[in-house]
Structure formats: C-alpha cells, structure tokens
Amino acid sequence: MKPVPLVLLLTSVLLTTHIPLSTCRPRDLSLMNSQLDDVLLNGAGDGAMSYLVGEKLLQYLQRNLGAQKAGGVLHLPHFPTAQLHSPHEDNSLEELTEFSKRNDDPPISIDLTFHLLRNMIEMARNENQREQAGLNRKYLDEVGK
C-alpha cells in the first residue's frame, strides 16, 4: 500500500473510534418528536386509511413520549452489539406492523381469481382421484374373478 492511503485509513479509523456517541444524537428529543408529529399530521392525506394510520401512530408516539422523557438520551456501549433494542421495542415494532396490516375489507378481484383457481384445481384433483378409484375397483374385480 502507498503511504498516503495508509495514513488516511489510519486517521479515519482513529477519528471514528474516538467520537463519543452522544455527539451523534440530538440533544433535545422533544424537538424531534414535534417535527415528526407535524409531518404525520400534515402528510396524512384525505384517505380514511391514512387518517387511521396517522391516528394510531400519533397515539403510539404520545404513549411512548413519557418513556423517552424519563429515560433521556440512550447511552449505548462504545462497541455496538448485535442486539441493540430491548424487548419493549420488539413489542412496539409489532404494534407498528399491526397498523400496516390489511384490514377486513372484502377481497379484491385478484384474490377472488386465485381463490377460484385453487378451488377448480382441488375439484379436478378430487375428480381424478374418484376416477382412479373406480378404475382400481374395476381392475380388482377382474383380477379377483
């Protein structure tokens, strides 16, 4: 390796290992939460589904606001591990994915098409089995005589 790239690599590694993690995080989380609330409220659109999702997200953020204020800024270890989030965050991720799940609307036409196709295939399979069973009975009757 040439000396210039080696020196640049060495300095970048040394600089990144000595940066405290607190400098990479916002100092005031309430500012970030209020901006997120504004984005959610203004960008939700007029659709009923987007309104419901925005409402659920707003409830979720308000519910977790107390935990963020009480906990302050998270202090992570200097070397991050594979598991950075707590089990409580797993539950919150499940709640967020629950918001995006499909509701109980009637199925769309493509779903109906595939449902009908599956039913037709199953009916054809059952018919083939009945025909094969009839042929097997006929052969057994012939051989049994």
From Swiss-Prot:
Coiled coil: none
Phylogenetic lineage: Eukaryota, Metazoa, Chordata, Craniata, Vertebrata
Leader sequence segment: 1-22
Expression tissues: Expressed in the spinal cord and not in the brain, intestine, liver, or kidney.
Record-listed Valine amide modification sites: V143
PANTHER family: CORTICOLIBERIN/UROCORTIN (PTHR15035), UROCORTIN (PTHR15035:SF11)
Record GO terms (molecular function): hormone activity
GO cellular component: extracellular region
UniProt family annotation: Belongs to the sauvagine/corticotropin-releasing factor/urotensin I family.
Keywords: Amidation, Cleavage on pair of basic residues, Hormone, Secreted, Signal
Function: Urotensin is found in the teleost caudal neurosecretory system. It has a suggested role in osmoregulation and as a corticotropin-releasing factor. The non-hormonal portion of this precursor may be a urotensin binding protein, urophysin.
Designated name of the protein: UI
Organism, scientific name: Cyprinus carpio
InterPro entries: Corticotropin-releasing_fac_CS, CRF, Urocortin_CRF
Location relative to the cell: Secreted
